[in-house]
Swiss-Prot record:
NCBIfam families: rpsG_bact. The gene is rpsG. Gene3D superfamilies: Ribosomal protein S7 domain. HAMAP family: Ribosomal_uS7_B. It comes from Geobacter sulfurreducens (strain ATCC 51573 / DSM 12127 / PCA). It holds the Pfam family Ribosomal_S7. This is Small ribosomal subunit protein uS7. GO terms for cellular component: cytosolic small ribosomal subunit; ribosome. Belongs to the universal ribosomal protein uS7 family. GO terms for biological process: ribosomal small subunit assembly; translation. One of its GO terms (molecular function) is mRNA binding. CDD domains: uS7_Bacteria (cd14869). Transmembrane segments: none annotated. One of the primary rRNA binding proteins, it binds directly to 16S rRNA where it nucleates assembly of the head domain of the 30S subunit. Is located at the subunit interface close to the decoding center, probably blocks exit of the E-site tRNA.
Amino acid sequence: MPRRREVAKRVILPDPKFNDRVVAKLVSVIMLDGKKSTAERALYGALDIVSQKAGEEPVKVLKKCLDNIKPMLGVKSRRVGGSTYQVPVEVRADRRVSLAMRWLVRYANERSEKTITDKLAGEILDAYNNRGAAVKKREDTHRMAEANRAFAHYRW
């Protein structure tokens, strides 16, 4: 947290194939060891599979899938006296998107399909249909926030 001035947000350039910033950001989340072309190949392959199976525009399906994963509420630890409370807080808009992308990639990697392309396509389609591990993670996060609603007055 800088003391002097607000740090400017970096502008992410849209990806070359779909000309979309969300796809470009997801490529960055998928990327390991700076291998961007490998990450692009995996995501573009997954989006091709998604467009075949869903019969819709792949970017539209991806955005709907991310909307289904985005958490509205979360919990933050807050120490009061000698005990730590899980205080429910609303998640900021930019954090919602980044959490959704991280969860999508994380739970896609845990799937049993053989290639990362198939794993990503499967998780995207599951999230699009409100199923899958990433959507379950969002539901668990919301349930945790709801369970700790009694501590909402500790919000800061």
